[in-house]
């Protein structure tokens, strides 16, 4: 399964890069699929197939990778527009609402997605779900001095929140902003992402949560058909 998943991710990353045009300001996402997209972009810039591209990264990880590939970068504050943002997701529901933040980068990811004229999400087929939060935890970035209070407030909303602990250091995960992350499971999943996004963000001590509501324009899905990796495009239907 791991090899098939890699094939799906590569196919969808390559398809996303085909949407990039010369002269664009790009939002460069975070995570494994976005990393493949950044590598494909770097190859096209190196070969001359694309030119005059500027990237705005959503994480330190993405910044390091883009710099290694000689992709010109600017900060979010240095640009007045982003033509296209491409990023992955941890879960995508039928309404194109997302959970992001498995890499604890969701604050910057949401800032870039909200600024972009067009936001394209790249995922493999395992990320499509009927309801959010049944299989993946909802990340909530919190101020270090408030995580216990926020945890209690989330419990009052029906959520079980646990402080995310680091894997290769002692203590909790610390975000690029110097904050902590609570991973939340809502009882029964998330039935109303828009309402929960607003409610959680109104808790004192919360910087941002990993629900991305009404931001996505297109989802590119990598999938295996007859043993070969392909890509399916899902366009959001206008209501």
Curated annotation (Swiss-Prot):
Q: Which reaction does it catalyse?
A: aldehydo-D-ribose 5-phosphate = D-ribulose 5-phosphate
Q: Select a single GO molecular function from the record's annotations and give it.
A: ribose-5-phosphate isomerase activity
Q: In which pathway does it act?
A: Carbohydrate degradation; pentose phosphate pathway; D-ribose 5-phosphate from D-ribulose 5-phosphate (non-oxidative stage): step 1/1
Q: Where does substrate bind?
A: 30-33, 87-90, 100-103, 127
Query: Which InterPro entries does this entry report, sorted A to Z?
Result: NagB/RpiA_transferase-like (IPR037171), Ribose5P_isomerase_typA_subgr (IPR020672), Ribose5P_isomerase_type_A (IPR004788)
Q: Which GO terms describe its cellular component?
A: cytosol
Assigned protein family: Belongs to the ribose 5-phosphate isomerase family.
Q: What is this protein called?
A: Ribose-5-phosphate isomerase A
Q: Which organism is it from?
A: Parasynechococcus marenigrum (strain WH8102)
């Amino acid at each position: 399964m791991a090899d098939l998943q890699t094939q799906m991710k590569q196919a969808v990353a390559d398809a996303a890069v085909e949407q990039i045009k010369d002269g664009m300001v790009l939002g460069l996402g975070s995570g494994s699929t976005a990393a493949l997209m950044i590598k494909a972009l770097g190859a096209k810039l190196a070969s001359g197939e694309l030119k005059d591209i500027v990237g705005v990264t959503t994480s330190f990880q993405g910044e390091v990778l883009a710099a290694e590939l000689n992709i010109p970068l600017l900060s979010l504050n240095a640009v007045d527009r982003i033509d296209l943002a491409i990023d992955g997701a941890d879960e995508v529901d039928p309404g194109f609402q997302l959970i992001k933040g498995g890499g604890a980068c969701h604050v910057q990811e949401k800032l870039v997605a909200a600024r972009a004229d067009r936001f394209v999400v790249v995922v493999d087929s395992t990320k499509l779900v009927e309801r959010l939060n049944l299989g993946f935890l909802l990340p909530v970035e919190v101020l270090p001095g408030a995580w216990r209070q926020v945890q209690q407030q989330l419990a009052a909303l029906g959520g079980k929140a646990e402080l995310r602990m680091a894997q290769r250091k002692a203590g909790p995960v610390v975000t690029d902003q110097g904050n902590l992350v609570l991973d939340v499971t809502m009882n029964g999943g998330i039935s109303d992402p828009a309402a929960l996004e607003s409610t959680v963000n109104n808790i004192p001590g919360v910087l941002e949560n990993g629900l991305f509501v009404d931001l996505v324009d297109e989802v590119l899905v990598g999938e295996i058909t007859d043993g070969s990796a392909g890509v399916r495009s899902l366009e959001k239907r206008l209501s």
